[in-house]
Amino acid sequence: MSQPITRENFNEWMIPVYAPAPFIPVRGEGSRLWDQQGKEYIDFAGGIAVNALGHAHPELREALNEQASKFWHTGNGYTNEPVLRLAKKLIDATFADRVFFCNSGAEANEAALKLARKFAHDRYGSHKSGIVAFKNAFHGRTLFTVSAGGQPAYSQDFAPLPPDIRHAAYNDINSASALIDDATCAVIVEPIQGEGGVVPASNAFLQDLRELCDRHNALLIFDEVQTGVGRTGELYAYMHYGVTPDLLTTAKALGGGFPVGALLATEECARVMTVGTHGTTYGGNPLASAVAGKVLELINTPEMLNGVKQRHDWFVERLNTLNHRYGLFSEVRGLGLLIGCVLNADYAGQAKQISQEAAKAGVMVLIAGGNVVRFAPALNVSEEEVTTGLDRFAAACEHFVSRGSS
């Protein structure tokens, strides 16, 4: 008989790059999770904007099981039907002409940055290698993507870092304009900075970035790893802004909990990537592709996307009511079901403590830095689940405030 698994085993056996919650989830259904002791949680964290259709969605399980009964993997020496169907769905639904599949958002961003460098080198020469990114961004944990992220806390211990990456202030076109020039090969930007505090870009900022990239023959990359696949109420956030990138990265919700990532590209950009210039062993495997194809089928409908906008209103209305009572937040911001509650000055730096109180009360939330409590629930979360979860969150806020004043 195997020994019982406990949270303490994590501290004994795992490389300690995470500090997970004190409880271990063991079962999920929809927007609810249960831990080893049977305690129920309403899940407003969504696996960090991954579980777009909640836990154990029956149609995703069916898609996975059906493919699992056929074959799992062949490697990139062969293609498969599920990945080709998935590619066509993404092409039909977006600006893209071609797709590269991988396993995560970091891999998708790595591929985008490599493509941008090669595109510039092939067309203009090796001097055109500069990448402009933004402070407080997050693009992944590879050495290339963590360097683009603009958060020294994630990169300072891994020097020397890749060169020719500079960081402008987000939503500040003058700051960006000072860095973008004819030696710039790409600008990479999140339409909403997720890890950086749930900060939406302004329309003018993204439009001006598009114009600057066109003027200097640089590619515009939208990192939609967190904002993509219905999260904002459009299939991809660029559709809100009327600004079309040259490259777009997507992952997280694309697999609904199954690891998958993708780089979407125009034909002009894609043609520089020839056989052997990039690759991955597992990318586009039939299991991931079958699940992602079903995710897109379920999410890319007017009913689902309009429902996200409606659910945004449910959350914002109730969070504002809660805030009127407890006075924790200076702002509630975001698009669709990516929502950030910004702590006011009296509670600065205490987002983690609030998230811990929330878990005790039976609701799971995220943070985005020390000052923002973040919500990224399933896109199909019910009104009853929203009400129950936010009632629990209100109880957590009440306990947090009373504890601080006692």
Curated annotation (Swiss-Prot):
Cited Gene3D superfamilies: Aspartate Aminotransferase, domain 1 (3.90.1150.10), Type I PLP-dependent aspartate aminotransferase-like (Major domain) (3.40.640.10)
Covalent S-S links between cysteines: none
Biological process annotations from GO: alpha-amino acid biosynthetic process; arginine catabolic process to glutamate; arginine catabolic process to succinate; ornithine catabolic process
InterPro entries: Ac/SucOrn_transaminase_bac, AcOrn/SuccOrn_fam, Aminotrans_3, Aminotrans_3_PPA_site, Class-III_PLP-dep_AT, PyrdxlP-dep_Trfase, PyrdxlP-dep_Trfase_major, PyrdxlP-dep_Trfase_small
The UniProt record lists the keyword tRNA processing: no
Pathway note: Amino-acid degradation; L-arginine degradation via AST pathway; L-glutamate and succinate from L-arginine: step 3/5
Record PTM N6-(pyridoxal phosphate)lysine, positions in chain: 252
EC number(s) given by UniProt: 2.6.1.81
Keyword entries, A-Z: Aminotransferase, Arginine metabolism, Pyridoxal phosphate, Transferase
Swiss-Prot/TrEMBL cofactor(s): pyridoxal 5'-phosphate
Any one Gene Ontology molecular-function term assigned to this protein's record: identical protein binding
Catalytic reaction list: N(2)-succinyl-L-ornithine + 2-oxoglutarate = N-succinyl-L-glutamate 5-semialdehyde + L-glutamate
Pfam families for the chain: Aminotran_3 (PF00202)
Broad class of enzyme this protein falls into: transferase
Protein's job: Catalyzes the transamination of N(2)-succinylornithine and alpha-ketoglutarate into N(2)-succinylglutamate semialdehyde and glutamate. Can also act as an acetylornithine aminotransferase.
Similarity annotation: Belongs to the class-III pyridoxal-phosphate-dependent aminotransferase family. AstC subfamily.
PANTHER family for the chain: AMINOTRANSFERASE CLASS III, SUCCINYLORNITHINE TRANSAMINASE
Name by which UniProt lists this protein: Succinylornithine transaminase
Originating organism: Escherichia coli (strain 55989 / EAEC)
